[in-house]
């Protein structure tokens, strides 16, 4: 494909998917855009970089409520390309109504027109209906980028060794087994494992079995400590009861940082479960992003110093054409959690995005919070899925899979 004409749409996936599938030499966006053209150019450039595309991207403005102007714009692009011996294809999947009508008027004049059949992951050539199937593997960062956001940190890269992964999965099981005692235990670990500075955490710990700090009491949990040693997360555990002290060593810095983070184990449960499911092509946790795109005049460092909206999502998955945003809670979800997740879903995926709250607490199907989540299109995975080992099944169903 030489030249692809895209009718610019509010839904970002419509603007960029055909470029990923067909990798044309040139892409021309036609129509009015809803944001400054500099931002469109910046996110398009980032999109191309993320996906290794060498296509040349251009923008051709046309008046949104003027059929003649839309028709003239599309016609001039087609004539220019044909005069240079280049084939032209118009993607009519997105775009405003008049732009679509204008593009449709070129059916039958030798210009190819394509349309996305998203239910079957294929493009249809009009009017004959020839189908081109594709297997979309879109990264989580690409979804955020094309919607006008910038990922600036993925908290955990999950570059774990085989040994580390086995240990982490054992600790995840302990997290659920000792759920009622875990929070208090982690508070104790946090106090005895304080960093000397922001870069360094000592792996060797020597601490009292219990103590008070600022009126708060902290106490070790022997059962959990012994289980962590069996799992390999800590080593050389020595509990000296007559001296009311203990000492041990963390397996390494990664495990030390994980063990003092209470909420990370639910995120990691979601991560490893999704990672083992072939339907998800990209899986990330601790994804931080801002609602803007840096450019030459305003680099990322400046964006981060300004009051630009930003979020951290506990888990972001990619399934075909759909981004999946998951908020993990070790408490019952609140309305504020639903509002925040819904705003992210609408901004960075719209009709294509899925949103889920995963909680270790029970959520009654007749409760106001469940009913509101349903009204907002947000799925809920509660403690029953974890207790019955049905997390993978629930993730599949809530992100587009069929009930078994």
Tell me what each language-model feature is.
Residues 1-87, 101-310, 322, 346-404:
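Long, low-complexity, Lys/Arg-enriched
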Residues 9, 94, 330:
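Short glycine-/small-residue-rich Rossmann-like dinucleotide-binding loops
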Residues 311, 339-340:
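Charged helix-capping and loop-helix junction motifs
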């Amino acid at each position: 494909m030489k030249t692809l004409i895209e009718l610019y749409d509010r839904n970002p996936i419509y603007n960029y998917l055909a470029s990923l599938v067909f990798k044309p030499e040139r892409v021309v966006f036609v129509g009015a855009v809803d944001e400054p053209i500099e931002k469109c150019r910046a996110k398009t450039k980032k999109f191309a970089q993320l996906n290794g595309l060498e296509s040349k991207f251009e923008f051709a403005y046309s008046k949104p409520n003027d059929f003649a102007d839309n028709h003239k714009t599309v016609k001039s692009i087609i004539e220019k390309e044909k005069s240079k011996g280049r084939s032209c294809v118009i993607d009519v999947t997105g775009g405003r109504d008049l732009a679509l009508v204008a593009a449709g008027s070129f059916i039958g004049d030798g210009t190819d027109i394509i349309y996305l059949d998203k239910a079957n992951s294929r493009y249809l050539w009009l009017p004959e209906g020839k189908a081109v199937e594709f297997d979309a593997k879109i990264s989580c960062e690409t979804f955020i980028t094309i919607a006008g956001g910038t990922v600036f940190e993925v908290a955990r890269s999950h570059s774990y060794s085989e040994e580390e992964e086995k240990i982490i999965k054992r600790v995840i099981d302990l997290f659920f087994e000792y759920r009622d005692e875990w929070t208090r235990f982690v508070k104790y670990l946090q106090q005895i494992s304080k960093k000397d500075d922001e870069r360094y955490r000592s792996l060797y710990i020597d601490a009292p079995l219990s103590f008070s700090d600022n009126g708060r009491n902290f106490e070790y949990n022997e059962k959990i400590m012994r289980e962590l040693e069996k799992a390999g997360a800590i080593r050389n555990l020595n509990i000296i009861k007559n001296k009311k002290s203990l000492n041990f060593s963390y397996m390494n810095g990664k495990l030390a940082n994980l063990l003092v983070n209470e909420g990370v184990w639910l995120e990691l449960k979601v991560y490893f479960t999704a990672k083992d499911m072939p339907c998800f092509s990209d899986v990330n946790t601790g994804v931080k992003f801002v609602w803007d795109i840096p450019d030459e005049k305003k680099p990322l460092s400046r964006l981060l110093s300004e009051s630009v909206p930003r979020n951290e999502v506990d888990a972001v998955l990619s399934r075909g054409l759909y981004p999946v945003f998951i908020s993990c809670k070790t408490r019952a979800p609140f309305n504020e959690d639903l509002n925040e997740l819904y705003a992210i879903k609408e901004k960075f995926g719209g009709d294509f995005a899925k949103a889920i709250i995963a909680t270790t607490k029970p959520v009654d199907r007749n409760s106001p919070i469940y009913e509101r989540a349903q009204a907002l299109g947000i799925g809920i995975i509660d403690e029953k899925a974890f207790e019955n080992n049905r997390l993978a099944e629930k993730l599949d169903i809530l992100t587009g899979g069929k009930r078994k």
